[in-house]
Regions:
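Feature captures the catalytic cores and cofactor-binding loops of soluble hydro-lyases/lyases
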Residues: 34-200
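Active-site and channel-lining beta-strand-loop segments
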Residues: 18-20, 191, 203-204
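Buried hydrophobic positions in well-ordered alpha/beta secondary-structure cores of metabolic enzymes
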Residues: 24, 140, 202-204
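Amphipathic alpha-helical packing elements
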Residues: 3-37, 44
Length: 205
């Protein structure tokens, strides 16, 4: 039971035969990402559909920045569940053994690189489900350059985030509360976003 385990990531993405990041995530080339930035959602969806991947689209999001150019990048995933004391203690012990510090959301953001997109399942939690605030959004922007986040949950500090350039965060709700009462059970593991399944390294559009 490890977070961001290279062997697990390689096993779950075994169809990928190209380059990988040190953590095992598939590294789709920069040139492919750039081509996708100039395609429509219908064109991108059709590519997945032709591969019989029928559960790769989820709409019904709000976004922090309304831009004509889509946010495209490689997924770094996080899966959260409602807090339960015994599980929380086990996950915190595991994180400590791997040298992780701070809050759950900080662990994942610390590992982001250029063109990453932070994809997080917070079970559609709004109050106390505010995964990203102004400070964390700034760090995401600095690390990903033009990436962002997809949050099946909520965010806070919306006005502050909207002042940050070259980032877009897709989210379900907004709330002023801090994040609490959640436990991270998967970091770069399979992640459900509504009706879609996301694996680490997937291209996010």
């Amino acid at each position: 039971m490890q977070f961001n385990n290279r062997d697990d990531i390689i096993q779950m993405t075994s169809y990928w035969t190209g380059e990988r990041f040190p953590d095992g995530r598939p590294r789709v080339s920069d040139s492919v990402l750039e081509r996708l930035r100039n395609m429509s959602i219908e064109e991108v969806w059709r590519l997945a559909w032709m591969k019989l991947n029928n559960y790769q689209f989820q709409g019904e999001f709000k976004c922090t920045h309304n831009t004509q150019k889509p946010t495209v990048g490689r997924a770094v995933t996080a899966t959260f569940v409602p807090i339960r004391e015994d599980l929380e203690l086990a996950m915190m012990r595991q994180a400590k053994s791997q040298g992780m510090k701070g809050m759950y959301n900080q662990w994942v953001v610390d590992g982001l690189v250029e063109d990453d997109v932070f994809v997080a399942d917070l079970f559609d939690k709004t109050e106390y489900g505010t995964l990203v605030g102004g400070n964390l959004a700034t760090v995401i922007r600095q690390k990903t350059k033009r990436g962002g986040a997809v949050v099946w949950g909520s965010i806070r500090d919306l006005q502050q985030i909207r002042e940050i350039e070259d980032i877009n965060i897709f989210y379900r709700g907004f709330h002023p509360s801090p994040i609490r009462d959640i436990t991270l059970v998967g970091y770069n593991a399979p992640c459900r976003i509504g009706h879609a399944t996301c694996l680490p390294g997937d291209v996010v559009y």
